[in-house]
């Protein structure tokens, strides 16, 4: 915050004239200072996402990914990828490499089968949250565990706060009742809530009833929030959002949230620079 003092000299020997001019000057500076600290937002309606249908995979990209490139949608702070994936029965992503990325998977429905070069082999489903810290490099595969139904999940990539870490894997099963009319933390930097991520980043998920209101406090200056409505309707930071709409918000200490319909909300806090 900048503090300014304006001194206005008036040749007229009228005290009230000088007071009025000084007051007007201070009001102008106050207005300028407030304008500099205005909350910033970017709105990403659901229809503006990249889309690809590969038959076995129907995917929507919030940020540039694979063959979809939008120079204005490269990332939001340290948030690099937010893919909304649906994989048909028995299909999936074959074994492939990653490095220096924090990769979070959040199943929405169905069962997702995971295997990796660290020796992990598991199936995750709604209520589970998985993270791979790729670090110096890992190999992994993800496939639909079931033959007769789709698996739907969010694939989220966050840039780490340090390169070439030793690869790690984390998984947790959350109590869905803890998401009822509140924001449940499912990812945090120290792992005290949810799984641990190597970044100043917190993920929250909420299952909200119409009329629910709250305010989310960011974890310090330089942080931003990216909120996506998974189902229903929610107003975040004054921006009305429908299903799969998203808004990015930064340059603020708090964000007001109101469910205008029964809804499911994902909120991702990340540093805007890292």
Predicted segments, located by residue:
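Cysteine-centered motifs
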Residues: 4-5, 10
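Bacterial N-terminal signal peptides that target proteins for export
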Residues: 14-21
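A short glycine-rich, His/Asp/Glu-containing loop-to-beta-strand
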Residues: 53-97, 101-102, 153, 160, ...
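Histidine-centered metal-chelating micro-motifs
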Residues: 92-94, 111-114, 130-131, 135-143, ...
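Glycine- and acidic-residue-biased ligand/ion/polar-headgroup-sensing regions
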Residues: 99-118, 126-129, 216-237, 243
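Ligand-binding loop in jelly-roll beta-barrel domains
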Residues: 119-121, 134-164, 251-274
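Acidic/His-leaning functional-site neighborhoods
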Residues: 172-264, 271-274
């Amino acid at each position: 915050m900048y503090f300014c003092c304006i001194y206005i000299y008036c040749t007229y020997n009228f005290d009230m004239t000088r007071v009025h001019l000084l007051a007007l000057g201070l009001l102008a500076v106050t207005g300028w200072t407030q304008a500099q600290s205005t909350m910033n937002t970017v709105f990403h309606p659901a229809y503006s996402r990249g889309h690809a249908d590969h038959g076995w995979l129907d995917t929507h990209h919030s940020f540039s990914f694979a063959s979809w490139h939008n120079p204005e949608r490269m990332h939001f702070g340290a948030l690099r990828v937010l893919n909304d994936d649906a994989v048909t029965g028995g299909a999936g992503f074959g074994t492939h490499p990653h490095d220096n990325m924090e990769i979070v998977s959040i199943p929405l429905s169905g069962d997702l089968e995971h295997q990796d070069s660290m020796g992990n082999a598991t199936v995750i489903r709604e209520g589970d949250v998985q993270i791979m810290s790729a670090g110096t490099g890992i190999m992994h595969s993800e496939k639909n565990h079931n033959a007769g139904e789709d698996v739907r999940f969010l694939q989220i990539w966050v840039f780490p706060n340090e390169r070439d870490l030793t690869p790690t894997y984390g998984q947790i099963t959350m109590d869905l009742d803890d998401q009822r009319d509140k924001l449940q933390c499912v990812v945090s930097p120290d792992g005290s809530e949810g799984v641990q991520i190597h970044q100043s980043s917190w993920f929250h998920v909420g299952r909200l009833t119409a009329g629910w209101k709250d305010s989310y406090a960011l974890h310090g200056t330089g942080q931003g929030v990216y909120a996506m409505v998974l189902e229903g309707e929610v107003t975040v930071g004054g921006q009305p959002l429908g299903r799969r709409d998203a808004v990015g918000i930064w340059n603020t200490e708090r964000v007001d949230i109101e469910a205008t319909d029964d809804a499911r909300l994902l909120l991702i806090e990340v540093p805007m620079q890292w």
